[in-house]
Amino acid sequence: MLFLQPRLLLLTPLLLVALYFILPDAVINRFASIGNLGDSSTSYRVYIWMGTLAMLKDYWMCGIGPGDAAFNLVYPKYSYSGIVAPHAHNLFLQIVCDAGVVALVVFVLLLFHYFRDLCAAFCREKDPFSRLYQTAAVSGIAGFLVQAMTDYSFYNYRVLFLFWAWLALGSLLARRGQLPERGLRT
């Protein structure tokens, strides 16, 4: 399969440079503004994170309880510049807000085992299609976690369900090589 050739990875930097000339200016400007605190979206999130961290100084052990109602009840006392926010705009901060630092440790350990098991299975796997599926399972969760650094999507139950379903599918793909193959019964 052409797309699984390691030599094609050498083309990645060239493709990234080509994106600069292909993407619309609005997209390029948005990427350029990510680290700029003068950008309203970036400064908004930074202020929310600062307020959330101030709140977690008092509620780090057990959190404030799940849901946006609990967050909206407690957060305004800690918010910077009077910024109103429905959630922490960061998955990891929101987990600590909802259930405390122990929940965050459990979540991070779960993710560690997920990535470790899938990467180990990828190294053992000989079937190129299985390797492709394992790569997709790792990439899907990794991409979600990168996005989760600047937003909290679990308030949407469809996204929450898809996240856990994707984790379950990836875990199954990690253990697929250990399962006995069974033919169709006639």
What is each stretch, according to the model?
Residues 18-27, 111-114, 145, 150, ...:
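Hydrophobic membrane-targeting signal helices
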Residues 9-10, 14, 135-186:
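Transmembrane alpha-helices of multi-pass inner-membrane enzymes
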Residues 1, 99-142:
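Hydrophobic transmembrane alpha-helices and their immediate junctions
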